[in-house]
Amino acid sequence: MDLLVAHGGDPAGSNMARYLAEGMEPDGKIWHGRHFDLVIIDSPAISADWIGGEYEYDGYVFLSRHGAESGKLALTCHSTGNFAEAQFGGSDREVAIPYPGFQRRYMRRLSERREKFNGFDITIEATHHGPTGLDKPSIFVEVGTTEKQWNDKGLCGAVAELVRETAEEQDEKTPFVICVGGTHYPEKFTDVLLKGEYALGTVVPKRALVNLDDKMFSHILERNAGAAAVLVDEGGLGPEKRRILNMLEGSGLEVISA
């Protein structure tokens, strides 16, 4: 069973959580359901490395707002981790265990209902921010991109309903890949997730490749145990391309071009 987590100070997360809490059984700080439980926490979700020690579940789904300087409307879903210094939660040079099956089921459901979300980009993001220390899979589901959307109870409720449906659906155990290259909003990897045969694990963007050395990649492999391959956006590797490809080819995993 998964635990859905929202920060009480996050308007989008709180609105999604309140929608989901209807019909669930309150028990102290926890709401119990048939297929998942829910908790609203007092501290930011990006700093919730502690939550696995207090609430033991099979996986953790964080309900959150999404922000961007561009203000472009987006509904996003991403794994967490820091490839260098931890500036927004988690630990330095640590990535979380991703939740590929949940992300794939949620994003495909979101894409199928995209007519309900006119004007919104439906996209994954590269792996970023915390928490990073949980010993079970985790994923962020986010509503963006301004206070207007975060406080839109109808929008947040519609997204939360898709989260509910996803949590109630059995994981089909789709093979997943580690992704390397591309931008923060990697279109090629999103297309693979929505239309291809793979789910996605950790996504390392081009801007982080300068920090991707053998030690960091070994850690990523450990946190993505069972990955079927490494999916590479070769056009999105920048000046690190040859070094990165040589390192990936020595990993023992198949390297596939996106």
From Swiss-Prot:
Its cofactor is Zn(2+). Binds 2 Zn(2+) ions per subunit. The keyword S-adenosyl-L-methionine does not apply. Keywords: Hydrolase, Metal-binding, Zinc. Pfam families: tRNA_deacylase. Coiled coil: none annotated. It catalyses: a D-aminoacyl-tRNA + H2O = a tRNA + a D-alpha-amino acid + H(+); glycyl-tRNA(Ala) + H2O = tRNA(Ala) + glycine + H(+). Its EC number is 3.1.1.96. It is an enzyme of class 3 (hydrolase). InterPro entries: Deacylase_DtdA_archaea, DtdA. One of its GO terms (molecular function) is zinc ion binding. Transmembrane segments: none annotated. GO terms for biological process: D-amino acid catabolic process. Monomer. Belongs to the DtdA deacylase family. D-aminoacyl-tRNA deacylase with broad substrate specificity. By recycling D-aminoacyl-tRNA to D-amino acids and free tRNA molecules, this enzyme counteracts the toxicity associated with the formation of D-aminoacyl-tRNA entities in vivo. HAMAP family: Deacylase_DtdA. PANTHER family: D-AMINOACYL-TRNA DEACYLASE. This is D-aminoacyl-tRNA deacylase. It comes from Cenarchaeum symbiosum (strain A). The lineage of its organism: Archaea, Nitrososphaerota, Candidatus Cenarchaeales, Candidatus Cenarchaeaceae, Candidatus Cenarchaeum.
